[in-house]
Amino acid sequence: DGKFPNLALMKISTYHKLNGDNVDFATIGDYDKLYISKLFKFSELNLNTLITANETIVGGSGYDLSVHLPNEIEICEPDYSIYPMYDFSLQFYSRGCIRNCPFCIVRQKEGNIKSVKPMALNPNGNRIEVLDNNFFANPDWKLAIDDLLSTKQTVNLHGVDVRIINEEQAYWLNKLKHHKQIHI
């Protein structure tokens, strides 16, 4: 769907590997099971006719907001090995949002903001893409900053709501090594 590896597919990969299955990120071949995920409704579904599978499972918010990964998969750490071309980590410190913008599906999909346990980082990563929808609305934002500082990696924050940021948060935001501009 975009410039990032698909987190759901990475967790599905870990789940299957933990259960003794062989996992490939496939563009060609015959498989027992094929997973297809898309984040956005407008994303084209490019079903490659060079892939055949006994079972095909499609999912993601681009298909149906009400369907979620089963808990036994959701709790798995991401398997970055299926995306060797990415040299960064994805991270969430919160899910959901305090806003309910009419153009956005986050509140419908994830509910109100809540802190979540950080995921394992990409062992080959050199920066962290923090994908929280509203980083400083997280009641545990300071723990998130501490965690980011402890990694000594550059950070790209994707959700900073300048309408709610206070002086203390601005101070700690300035302590991070930023990879790019902060996304507001």
Report the location of each language-model feature:
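Short, solvent-exposed loop/turn segments at secondary-structure junctions
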Residues: G2-K3, L39-S43, G62-L65, C97-R99, ...
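Ser/Thr/Gly-rich flexible loops in soluble cytosolic domains mediating phosphotransfer, phosphorylation
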Residues: E55-S81
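Conserved acidic residues
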Residues: Y31-Y35, P102, N126-I128, K180
